[in-house]
Amino acid sequence: MSVETERSSTESSAASGLDFEDTALTLRLPGSSSSSSSSSSSSSSSSPSEPDRKRASATDDDPDNRLGSTATESPPSPKARVVGWPPVRAFRKNALAALAAASSSKAKFVKVAVDGAPYLRKVDLEAYRGYDQLLAALQDKFFSHFTIRKLGNEEMKLVDAVSGNEYVPTYEDKDGDWMLVGDVPWKMFVETCQRLRLMKSSEAVNLAPRSA
């Protein structure tokens, strides 16, 4: 009698479309078995396998890969040009160099020799405005006891007050000729003078001043 009752209940449940597991008395809620099985299958499919995890950890531990990823992700920023004191110092240095070059280009230094003196001196012709200033400078550079004597024909001499010797200021022009100082205009003298010589009057007798 009980066997027939169980068979009839099974047939009725099959006819209604329900399985025996759905109608069985269990501790879980109805329908939880299917959801738990589906979730377990999805988690197993989504979780990586053991070889995949090993490959991923090996890739993370490789320093070359880390450097490559860092280089691709964050390129180095270009260095900004620093503008400050160095350019200012360079500008001042260039300005001073240009000023020094301009001043040196205007200067004209020539050698000065005195008969009987064992040394030479140099004078800047551009620093003077005329023959009087030049002779005064020569007097100060060599012997303080020299005096300047002017003759009637505008010829000038330096006289040694101690020995009484007279010196005639002469110069060598661009052609290599020795001329008397004062025979040409001052600007022409500055342009053509190559060197100066205070020559003794006894040796300068053959030199005659040119007509201006």
Swiss-Prot record:
InterPro entries: AUX/IAA_dom (IPR033389), AUX_IAA (IPR003311), PB1-like (IPR053793)
Keyword field contains Methyltransferase: no
Chain coiled-coil ranges: none
Record region (Disordered): 1-84
SUPFAM superfamilies with a match to the protein in the record: CAD & PB1 domains
PROSITE patterns: PB1
Pfam family, one: AUX_IAA
Biased composition (Low complexity): 32-49
Domain PB1: 107-201
Physiological role: Aux/IAA proteins are short-lived transcriptional factors that function as repressors of early auxin response genes at low auxin concentrations.
UniProt record similarity statement: Belongs to the Aux/IAA family.
Summary of subunit composition and partner proteins: Homodimers and heterodimers.
PANTHER family: AUXIN-RESPONSIVE PROTEIN IAA15, AUXIN-RESPONSIVE PROTEIN IAA17
Protein name: Auxin-responsive protein IAA15
Organism listed in the record: Oryza sativa subsp. japonica
Annotated gene: IAA15
